[in-house]
């Protein structure tokens, strides 16, 4: 598979390392400080290409649209851009584009999401009060994280005692 890395920070480097170990080809690395490879990307054939997007909340939407302009499917792990999600979904439907996105791709965290939903249901039945606390490194770009937002939204969806969350 040919891969475009959109965002070449910590996650971009990790994705690259694993992709190369598995025999995939990195055809472009696009980062906020280095947009040099964009023209090469536009000139390449786009079949058998997927873009893996781990950039920033400020650039994710632009990156997704750039890929859609070239009919390149996107896997997006960036959060903090979801206020534009409805328009991206509409574009996917209208133009038959492909987007797979999640606030966290970790298997362990996705198990935690499921357990959180069950806990929210049980706590409603027995009257327990739920709260979330999140701690991150100082370089975290989206605060609260998409993971924390997903946990909070799942509690609201699973427990009628909650209808919103706040910082």
Predicted stretch roles:
Residues 2-6, 10-42, 58, 126-167:
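C-terminal substrate-binding/catalytic lobe of Rossmann-fold NAD(P)-dependent oxidoreductases
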Residues 106, 120, 137-141:
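Short beta-strand and adjoining strand-loop segment in the mid-core
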Residues 26, 74-75, 98-99:
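Hydrophobic beta-strand scaffold residues
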Residues 32, 79-81, 104-105, 135-137:
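Short, ordered loop/turn segments at secondary-structure junctions
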Residues 41-78, 86-91:
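Rossmann-fold NAD(P) dinucleotide-binding segment
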Residues 6, 54-55, 77-78, 102, ...:
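Structural motif
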Residues 65, 69, 78-101, 107-121:
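Rossmann-fold NAD(P)-binding glycine/threonine-rich loop
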């Amino acid at each position: 598979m040919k891969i475009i890395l959109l965002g070449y920070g910590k996650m971009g480097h990790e994705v690259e390392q694993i992709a190369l170990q598995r025999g995939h080809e990195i055809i472009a690395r696009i980062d906020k400080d280095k947009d040099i490879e964009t023209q090469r990307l536009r000139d390449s054939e786009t079949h058998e290409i997927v873009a893996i997007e781990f950039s920033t909340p400020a650039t994710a939407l632009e990156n997704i649209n750039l890929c859609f302009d070239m009919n390149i499917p996107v896997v997006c792990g960036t959060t903090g851009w979801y206020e534009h999600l409805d328009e991206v979904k509409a574009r996917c439907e209208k133009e038959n584009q492909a987007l797979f996105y999640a606030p966290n791709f970790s298997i362990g965290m996705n198990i935690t999401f499921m357990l959180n939903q069950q806990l929210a249901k049980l706590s409603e039945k027995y009257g327990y009060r739920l709260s979330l606390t999140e701690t991150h490194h100082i370089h975290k770009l989206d605060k609260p994280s998409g993971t924390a937002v997903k946990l909070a939204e799942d509690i609201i969806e699973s427990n009628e005692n909650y209808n919103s969350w706040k910082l």
